[in-house]
Design a protein with these regions (language model features):
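Short beta-alpha junction loops
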Residues: 75-83, 106-108
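Active-site metal-binding core of divalent-cation-utilizing nuclease and nuclease-like domains
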Residues: 1-44, 50-59, 65-66, 86-88, ...
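Arginine/glycine-rich "motif VI" loop of SF2 helicases in the C-terminal RecA-like domain
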Residues: 63-72, 96
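Structural beta-sheet core signal
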Residues: 44, 73-76
Length: 129
């Protein structure tokens, strides 16, 4: 599964936010836009896979926070069960920049999506059952 898939699962099923929101900004005479992986009422969350391409996560989270006025967060998707060089670098940079850093297991997200329909029913033993 790719970053976009993990972001959609986390954002909609766990964080209660909106995935892939767009925000515009101007640079000189040009108009540009960014996409935020997950946006909640209080946070902009940059979802990153544990690989080299995630090294720009801190910058992306900070710029999204600048545009929205919300708290920046990095959510690292752990696919191999270990803390590697990229997670170490990103976590250190996030701490230096005062950006929240969170980790979540990729397999957990997949299982959460696969069983989400089960959480749409009332719990056994709930009043009236």
């Amino acid at each position: 599964m790719n970053e976009l898939g993990f972001a959609a699962i986390f954002c909609t099923l766990i964080a209660g936010g909106e995935a892939e929101t767009q925000h515009g900004y101007s640079a000189g005479y040009d108009l540009h836009r960014i996409r935020v992986d997950c946006e909640t009422e209080a946070e902009v969350i940059e979802v990153a896979l544990d690989k080299r391409g995630a090294l720009d996560s801190v910058q992306q989270a900070l710029f999204a926070a600048h545009l929205t006025g919300k708290a920046p967060v990095i959510l690292m998707i752990d696919r191999d069960g270990r803390t590697g060089p990229y997670e170490t670098r990103i976590k250190a940079a996030a701490q230096m920049a005062n950006v929240a850093y969170r980790e979540i297991d990729a397999d957990f997200l997949i299982r959460w999506q696969m069983t989400s329909y089960l959480r749409n029913y009332p719990a056994v033993g709930a009043p009236g059952l």
